Amino acid sequence: MVKFSKVLMLMVLAGTVSAAFAAEGDPMARAVFYGALAIGAGVAIGAAAGGGAAGLGNAIRGVLEGMARNPNMGPKLLTTMFIGMALIETFVLYALLIAIIFIFTGIFDSKAGF
């Protein structure tokens, strides 16, 4: 666990240093910065998709258990499950949208003021 936290701290430090160098206009540092931004966006989308998949699995499991206990509640449970699944999927789509905005708008560019 200590080794993991050290590696994580080193990665965060490397990301901040590349952002500082990118502000100076060095082309290699800008390439590293945007590469790190792309990797971070991919990790964010992967984490959102993994969390969404776990949430969908739990929702389906709960509905199937409810249907097994009381088959007459099946249609009501299915309706509620589909609404919940739509809300879980919007979480993943929001993560994708935010990642696309970060990558293509240059929001962290030094000219933007951030």
Swiss-Prot record:
This is ATP synthase subunit c. GO terms for cellular component: plasma membrane; proton-transporting ATP synthase complex; proton-transporting two-sector ATPase complex, proton-transporting domain. It holds the Pfam family ATP-synt_C. InterPro entries: ATP_synth_csu_bac/chlpt, ATP_synth_F0_csu, ATP_synth_F0_csu_DDCD_BS, ATP_synth_F0_csu_sf, ATPase_proteolipid_c-like_dom, F/V-ATP_Csub_sf. It is a multi-pass membrane protein. F-type ATPases have 2 components, F(1) - the catalytic core - and F(0) - the membrane proton channel. F(1) has five subunits: alpha(3), beta(3), gamma(1), delta(1), epsilon(1). F(0) has three main subunits: a(1), b(2) and c(10-14). The alpha and beta chains form an alternating ring which encloses part of the gamma chain. F(1) is attached to F(0) by a central stalk formed by the gamma and epsilon chains, while a peripheral stalk is formed by the delta and b chains. It comes from the Bacteria. It comes from Sulfurihydrogenibium sp. (strain YO3AOP1). The record marks E89 as: Reversibly protonated during proton transport. HAMAP family: ATP_synth_c_bact. The chain crosses the membrane at residues 31-51, 88-108. Its main location: membrane. GO terms for molecular function: lipid binding; proton-transporting ATP synthase activity, rotational mechanism.
